[in-house]
């Protein structure tokens, strides 16, 4: 049985098509303005979920990059501190060699002792170098200085400052001050006190060279470990940059709309809407019978 198509049915269909065209045009305009494929989760629930997962990975990767930058700054400071420490000890060694000259008189030996004491003060200041409000040779200790005036180390044995640079990777960014400079009676500061006292009292100091050399070697050993950790962090930085680029590409593939494609779609929707307007205008034109009713 053939169904009769009335004017009202035709009009309603035309209006629905017009509304649909207007809705599609509005969506195309929104996409062209924002260049977002996913204006709302309902656009593509699966893609939206994947985009959120990638954004979470990007946030974590960005945090690792910040940790790498902070850790690198820590290790730069530690390395510089240890280099300065080694240089000061090299000067102490030179003074020790000079002090081994048996022909030196009391005044000359006293002058050398005063230089050793000056280097000790410089060494203490260097050993207490801070970064971001923390002593770089005191581990996790919140003490204001890594070493007290008497050479006692204020750090906590085995407690290290670390930075997480990956899901399963954390790197130590400080250095063990006691391993480099000793502590208390075994510290380099006590060694320099004894050296200055020996110089003043006329006690031969050549035997102190072995102790100075040993302490210089311990500083270099700690510095070598710092260098290895710094190299690890720099390698990690390159990996994180690559990961950032890859994740951004994945995110853009899911979320970002190509400008040319967006403009083309907008033009198509505008043309379609204009056609729908023209058709609807004809459908809604009053007929002769409308005027005769």
Feature roles, as predicted:
Residues 1-142, 197-293:
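Amphipathic alpha-helical polymerization modules
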